[in-house]
Structures are given as structure tokens and as C-alpha cells.
């Protein structure tokens, strides 16, 4: 075994997948750790020498591991396929971590016994945004924007406390978005489900982010969609290229497409920021006039030099849009695919929604909170179709396990969600599973779709879980509920009952099948 004293310490980068995925990336920046050493599967790690002795998932053939991770970018082989097997071999049977490659970086996959240590890790030791910035090469387009806590402050201090009052605005925009993207359909019409839901959710999300005027500005909607797409593509792609220390330099030189989209989006948004700043200086009650994240960003005290500059505030809004729209869109898409695959749930869901809305006199926040069957359906969908096969959570551990600064650490979310020790009949979709749990065990809040625990990692875990999950679940509920109340659905090409298109994996990132097509028809207009 290697000596601990011979292993150097490095600055840490921790990257993860997911909607939450994106919003739960953390970086270990303060605490020094020494190395953990194992006997099995020794190999030399070219990116992180301090992890040279951690076993890989394919310990007998490390080259096969590297080729799969670096070359087969779209293959499930390097992530989804081995997750359950290696959870059993290392995480469960031995209680040990193992090493794998995700998005071009080496990661130590942790057993769940370390999650309580993760939960207690302080914000002073874990930096939310720096890892995300490094992983997506964001410094090339927005500099050190992610050294700021502005986006977290906007969500935690402004958005979350106002969610009850904001629900009617979300409802109004969801109705408008569905009318624009679907409309009245007396006859069946074919849609690509991922594209349709992405458009609806993007519109709905922006009502709370930038207000009614901008969220219905077709130019702004189009360019922010392009911005989000090019941000992900330009950021992720270069993590797979074998350029070693030159990778970051090449990423800087080839980011032109994303910079074009960033500048086009900023051109539309910047005048609104400047106008609101002028109104605020003139004494206008902007907090009441503009109940949206754009105004909260302007009002938030700067946490990093430059945060109070108009262009920085524009960039913060664009990146909030990127995080908030994509995650919820995938969530609604996965749920809608399950509505088609498991039609036995449709009428009970419709009955609950109509009853609760009538009881509360409309689509209020209280009404959404009492849709227990819908909430369970969403949580069960997320359990079986999480945003990533791995999620990132981290820190110093109770049993003496230590890792050096520089260690990327993730949790095997997909394997944990499918573990029969965690869920009865774990591989079967049971849409009302968590509604029964809430009744039987009398723990109403424990099993909500927005509640996190060691067995449900859709939004991360502990103090560093996604702070926007409460907003995300409200959007998913509203859009999904309104769709299933107003429309009928069927597959564009007939499928057996309980069969649905397979998820698409971009390494650890899981999304609903991008080519899935469905037919939609209005319920009250059908011929």
C-alpha cells in the first residue's frame, strides 16, 4: 500500500449531474484532507495523482475504463450500466468507495454510510458554484461570476419565502404557455414531447424570473433557449477531449458560439436592468412593482466584487434561467411519459386534482400542497428517472476516512434509488407508493417530492441540496396537472402497456428520450 505522506494535496473540484445536478455542485476549498488508500485495483490516475490507489470500477482493466469514459461519450456503458453492479461490489459489500470517470473527471463514488457527514458539512468548507463553473468552463464566458453567492441568495432569501404568493402567477403563466404551445385541439396532433414540455416550462419559469413583459417576449425566450443549449454543449464537450493541461486553453479559444448567444441575450435583458436601477434610484417601489428574480438580483447586496454591475446582474439572470428551466422541463417530461406508460393512474390523478381545486376555489398554493397522489407520482418518477446516475455530495467522514483536497466525490443516486434494501419492489413503477407511505406512517412531509433523504437524491442531500427544489416541484405540479386535466394523450406509435421510451444518457446526465413523440387532443373538444 502507498504511504499517506507521499500523496500530495490539491485544490478540489467537485462536479455533479442533474438539475438539481447543476445546482448541487460543490467544491472542497478550506479543509485539508489526507488520502484514502486501498489494495484492490491499483492504477495511475493522470488527472488526480493523489487518487492513484483508489480502485476503479473496472479494476482488472483500467484502460478499458478510461477508453469507455473518454471515447464513448453518449454510452450508458461508462455510467448507468455499471452503477448497480459496482454499488454492490464496493459500496455495499465492502463499505468502500470506488473510482470512476464522469464528464472527463475522476470521481470517488461514496457509500451511503458517509451521507450524514456530508449533511453536516458547512458552507465555509464547501463552495456551491465554483465547482460548477470549473466543470462547465464558465470562466471563459462570465469570468469569476460563480465566486459570488448572489444566485443562492436570490433563491433562499427572496424566492422561497414568497412561493405561496407567487403560485397564482405561475398558474397564470402555465395556462398561457400551454395555450400558446398546444392550444385547442379537437383532433389528435403529434408533438415531440421533450421539445413541447421544454417550451412550456421555459415560458412558465421566466414569469417568476424576469416578469410578465419579458417572459412573453418571443425574442428573449428564443435567445435564452439558445444560450442554455450552447452553455451546456460548450462547457461539457471539452471535458472529453484528450488535451491534458491544454484542454482549458482550447475551450477558451472555441467558445465563440456561446459568447454570441450570451451577448445576444444580454442585449435584450440589459436595458431592463438599467431601467429598473434608474427607477429604484428615483424612489419607485420596485419591490412591489416587480415581484421577480430580476429585481431581487438587483436588490441583493453584492457578495463579490463586480456583483452590483449591471452586466453581472444580467449574467446572473441568464444562469438562473439555465438552471431553473432545464431541470423542471425534464421532470415534467418524465412524468408525462409515465402517464402514457401507466394509464391506470390517469383517472385517479384527475379525480384528485378536480376535487382539490374545487375545494380551495382555484389553483392556490394550498391546493397544490394537498395533491398527495400527484406529489407521489412525481416523486416516484424522479426515483426511477433521476436527473443523473450519480449525484455529488461530499466531505470529511466519521470513521476516519479522509480524502485530499482535490478529490471529486459523488453518490450513486441511480443505484440507491433502485436498491431493494431501500424500496420494496424497487424496479417497479408504483405511482402512489409515497402517498401510501404518508398515510401509513403518519409522516406527511417526509415523503413529499421536495423532501430529501439518504434514499432519494434527486436534489442532492444535506445543507447543500438544491435550494430551488420547492419552486421546481410547484412548476412540475402545475404544468403536469393542467395538461392532464385539459388533454388526452396517446403514443404516436402504439406501445405495450407499461412500456415507455428509454432514458437517454450523456454519461452521468439522464434525460427523457429526446425523440419520443406523442399525440395530444383536447378533452372538451374531441370529436
Swiss-Prot record:
Keywords: Heme, Iron, Metal-binding, Monooxygenase, Oxidoreductase. GO terms for biological process: secondary metabolic process. Pathway: Mycotoxin biosynthesis. Its EC number is 1.-.-.-. One of its GO terms (molecular function) is heme binding. The keyword Heme applies. Its cofactor is heme. Heme binds at residue 466. The keyword Flavoprotein does not apply. PROSITE patterns: CYTOCHROME_P450. PANTHER family: CYTOCHROME P450 (PTHR46206), P450, PUTATIVE (EUROFUNG)-RELATED (PTHR46206:SF7). Cytochrome P450 monooxygenase; part of the gene cluster that mediates the biosynthesis of aspirochlorine (or antibiotic A30641), an unusual halogenated spiro compound with distinctive antifungal properties due to selective inhibition of protein biosynthesis, and which is also active against bacteria, viruses, and murine tumor cells. The non-ribosomal peptide synthetase (NRPS) aclP is responsible the formation of the diketopiperazine (DKP) core from the condensation of 2 phenylalanine residues. Belongs to the cytochrome P450 family. This is Cytochrome P450 monooxygenase aclB. The lineage of its organism: Eukaryota, Fungi, Dikarya, Ascomycota, Pezizomycotina.
